[in-house]
UniProtKB/Swiss-Prot annotation:
Keywords attached to this entry: Cytoplasm, Stress response
Record family assignment: Belongs to the small heat shock protein (HSP20) family.
Organism, scientific name: Ipomoea nil (Japanese morning glory)
Protein name in UniProt: 18.8 kDa class II heat shock protein
Compartment list: Cytoplasm
Length: 167
């Protein structure tokens, strides 16, 4: 369950409290009463994937020779970002923002927490003319830009000429 969909901030609840409650609900969704993560089940994996995808907005641009995917990922280290191609035509951008653990170890106390931590993911079905062998990913200033080059257009088929023989 995602509390942000219920507009609870309108009832005077602080974002930090909502974030803590959301974390508790996420943990409860992903663990049994003894605190163990259950064996991977397709439904749970789908729900986690859907949450991660909903929390990762992206822009997609088409240029004459390429497609460009842009996602804001402030606070994420480049080493925590994965760019992959699945099933020959699905671009997957995924990773995890884990700063919360580091801060807690250093004795830092959050007064307000609005930036999302945890896993993120986006999947994009690539068009037929996308060249999956020519993908470039650049991460700079908290913005990931993935460029997928287009395949050259196929040459038009030339008509086949059949020689007519005299019988």
């Amino acid at each position: 369950m995602d509390l942000r969909n219920f507009g609870l901030s309108n009832f005077g609840l602080e974002p930090q409290l909502l974030s803590t409650i959301q974390d508790m609900l996420d943990f409860a969704d992903d663990h049994d009463r003894a605190g163990r993560a259950p064996p991977e089940q397709p439904i749970r994996a789908y729900v986690r994937d859907a949450k991660a995808m909903a929390a990762t907005p992206a822009d997609v641009k088409e240029y004459p020779n390429s497609y460009v995917f842009i996602a804001d990922m402030p606070g994420v280290k480049a080493a925590e970002i994965k760019v992959q191609v699945e099933d020959d035509n699905v671009l997957v951008v995924s990773g995890e923002r884990t700063e919360r653990e580091k801060d807690e170890k250093d004795g830092v106390k959050y007064l307000r927490m609005e930036r999302r931590v945890g896993k993120f993911m986006r999947k994009f079905v690539l068009p037929e003319n996308a060249n999956v062998e020519a993908i470039n990913a650049v991460y700079q200033d908290g913005v990931l830009q993935v460029t997928v080059e287009k395949l050259p257009p196929p040459e038009p088929k030339k008509p086949k000429t059949v020689e007519v023989k005299v019988a």
